[in-house]
Amino acid sequence: MAAFSTAATERFVNKMVKHHQKYFPEWSRSLGADELGEFIRHGIERANLHGFETELNIARYLHVMQALGPNFDESGEYPWAERLLNRRLPPQAKMNHLRDAADYELEARRIRNANRD
């Protein structure tokens, strides 16, 4: 999206706001519309830094970011994500690896939480 116009970027932000409100309603309400828009803009910037430029890959990056946190790629909490995102891979391959690793992380978290109960 780095090459897209400001108008195209804002259309994409609005599309992603609606998407998140539909599929993640509680989470979206907890942020509010303005903060959700800022979250998405931040995600677009982070995705672009890692070589993701298509709407599909940026949307997928936003889903990972929503699940792991807005700065998952640099927080130190997920060193595997930082290593993966710094690898020289085609964007689609990098995204596939990122999604698989994030899914694994979320499943491991779910199991840890279930074992605490």
Task: For the regions a language model picked out, list residue spans one by one.
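A contiguous, surface-oriented mixed alpha/beta subdomain in the mid-to-C-terminal portion of proteins
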Residues: 1-117
